[in-house]
Amino acid sequence: MCIRDSLEYDSNPYPVVVDGGISYVIDAYTTSDRFPYGQFADTQQLPNDSGLVRNFNYVRNSVKVVVDAYDGDVDFYVVDPEDPILTSYRQVFGDLFQSASEMPEEVSSHLRYPEDLFIVQTGMWGRYYLDNVSDFFSGDLAWAVADNSDSQSAGTAITRIDRTDPANPRIVPDRSRPVDPYYQLTRLPDEDEVSFLISRPFVPADGLRELTSYFVGRTDETSQLELREY
């Protein structure tokens, strides 16, 4: 089936119980390396078996793949029908793709934010959250994902500011080990109900060990992805 070569897949499938049996949910992505003026993704933190370990500057988690663990039946559910790349695939592969409304409730109620996508987004957010041109180019207010306090590696962030040339400070990779994203069931500060979400903390990119912000991702009741920064 050629569609397997047209989508990229997350490295972390997860099981759900459907009609008394077990099915695995796999997050599938459409990608491109030809999005005009788009910054290429930093993929250095991804697991080696992630489908996103490649050059791209466009990515959308447009499909949820559900695989029956008993008989191997595979269903492709579209959760982002506005994705232009997926729209083209649907014209080619006909009835292979199903609407998200056809997804069993046992599956849709357990969808989670895709881990590999979150790793890429948080790896780049520390610089691109800035909306002031001067701050963006100086890098003085940039953030980085916090390092793992249990790591034996030196350093405190996945990026740091290189001031070798004072006139041209640069954000460069650090060799420390960043905190892995982690899923949790918790209540966000502005809400009354608990949510199942994925999160990651940020510190200043200059190496200070001060919690500056944390980023969370979750899937809402309509299967759409939602990101928040606190």
Q: Where are the model-predicted features located?
A:
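Soluble extracytoplasmic regions of secretory-pathway and membrane proteins
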Residues: 4-230
